[in-house]
Amino acid sequence: MTGVLPVALEDATKVLQALLLTGKEYVCVMQLHGSVSSEVVQQVLSEFVGEIYQRPPLRSSVKRRIRTRWIYRISFLEMQENNVLFSVGCQAGTYIRKLCHDIGEALGCGAHMRELRRVRTGPFTEEKLSTLYDLADAYAAWAEKGDEFLLRKLISPMEFGLSLLPKIYIRDSAVDAICHGANLAIPGIVKVETEIKSSDIVAVFTQKGEAIALAKALLSTEGILDL
């Protein structure tokens, strides 16, 4: 597999768990084991949009028990002979090679994943990709000349990784308590985004836009505003 792989440094590693909540997008080449028309392929692909059941493949890092995952969209791109190119937006933890296998079963001919490229993880897209060579050059410029420009161009602020999460903004007087593990009380909240649901994971920010913590909402947006 090639494509987007976010790498976090120091305290920003805590943001990686938030990326699991924001979904991923892939472009995949699926090889069919028999001849099927493109119209039939498109019809079957559309049937996999929504909540699906998956058992992780034999080579996986988790227990092989059936679980549900969401497929937000599947787009048929093109087909050459028995090779189908499609893009898919899905919940984190979805196994695309297992998805290809299941699509092949639904088609009645069998199929396997031939190539896979991740084009988005949360807010990180291909447009923001950097190579290890880019990083090595940027580090050399900093180490040899003290020039931080290239490093700052490559490294996104921690707050960018949280940009797709619902946010709560708090008063400066509440920051220290939150940083020491205290619960956030209603008086400490300055602004809250809409569509927060109870039990959602939210990002807590200062009024200056600095990320402070990840938290679990005990109330919805409406519940917070009513208090």
Task: Give the location of each predicted region.
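Non-catalytic RNA-recognition surface used by pseudouridine synthases
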Residues: 1-136, 179
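Accessory RNA 3′-end/elbow-binding domains used by RNA modification enzymes
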Residues: 2, 22, 44, 64-66, ...
